[in-house]
Amino acid sequence: MRLPGEPRSVTRGVGKTGWARLVLRSAAAPQVPSTLGFMNAGPSLSLAEWTVLALISEHPTHGFAISRLTAPGGDLGKIWHIPRPVIYRTIGRLEEAELVAAQAVEPGRGPQRTIYAATPAGRKAAADWLDTPVQHIRDVRSQLLIKLALLDRAGTDPTGLLQRQKIILEPIASAISAERSQHKGFDATLLAWRRATAAAALSFLDDITPSAASRV
């Protein structure tokens, strides 16, 4: 049963050969034209699964520590809250997909907590995901902000990602503007909203992308 607030996942029931299945499934999904050169094939995971995988890829950790980061007041939870039960279920799915593996049990008198580490395939998948721009304007608020927060935690310069993100969103915004001129009534109203949202997303990217001078 899917818990309240838990994103739908395509990795439920993945067996020990799950990694291969995930790669095949994602390869069949629509992709941005290869001329852009920065789309990375990888497993098809939910945002919760990507977030947990990226955190485990930073260093070996356990579900309780991750749940503190994704709680409403946590570093990532203020962007995208992931309830603690979902964290543990997500770790289980990542383990089944061979993206993480149990490493040890945390010593001490408290509750026994299993420490997980990312597998080589898991680390590569997380790195590729963090380096890939989102494909929809609606994902800027969630996926892109999570990626930027994770890159900041790692001390990684996000400039390249932000520049590639603009390349993805600019033609989308232009297409929306062109389409709006062909409609009337509520359709035009809806497209006006989408155009304003696209413009806001591009303005946001301009605001946070360091200039060439500031990077010298």
Label each region the model flagged.
Residues 162, 171-216:
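Charged, low-complexity intrinsically disordered regulatory/assembly segments
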Residues 82, 110-113, 157, 164, ...:
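A structural signal for alpha-helical segments
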Residues 127-167, 171-174:
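Amphipathic alpha-helical dimerization/coiled-coil segments
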Residues 30-138:
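Basic helix-turn-helix/winged-helix DNA-binding cores
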